[in-house]
Amino acid sequence: MTKETFQVVSAYDGTKLDALCFLPEGKPKGIFQILHGMCEYKERYQPFMSFLAEHGYIAAAHDHRGHGNSVSDKSDLGYFSDKTGKAVTEDAFAVTQALKKRYGDLPIILFGHSMGSLVAMNYLQKHETAIEKLVICGMPKKNIFVGVGLFLNGVISLFKGERHRS
């Protein structure tokens, strides 16, 4: 098994996304693209990626913007973008395109964990023909207090700015 690292430049706004791949020995069966959860990073999935590569898959993961090595400065940690969550979904699609360009037109299996499962669901709605299969793991459940949290976040952002850490 071989490990490769590379960067993908986001088509959304030019953010550099740090990516890691584990390559199997021999001809790969497909590409298993991993979307990690909130406050995680790609290296956390290395044992799983190793397992996938041992079973014939290219295992790929990237750090979402604001996570791991996909930040230009420590102040970017935890910050997605000044717009919406659309950037994270489009980043995942840019990584898919880079993987296909790099390794050929192999079947893509998209795996999303926790927050990554929400990204994967958005991805499916916008780019359903780009993947062959979808695996959802640890999907968050509906929370009745989300509205309160969003309201409080908005109030705090008015006074302390969007990048304030609470």
Where are these regions (language model features)?
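Alpha/beta-hydrolase fold nucleophile elbow
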Residues: 103-114
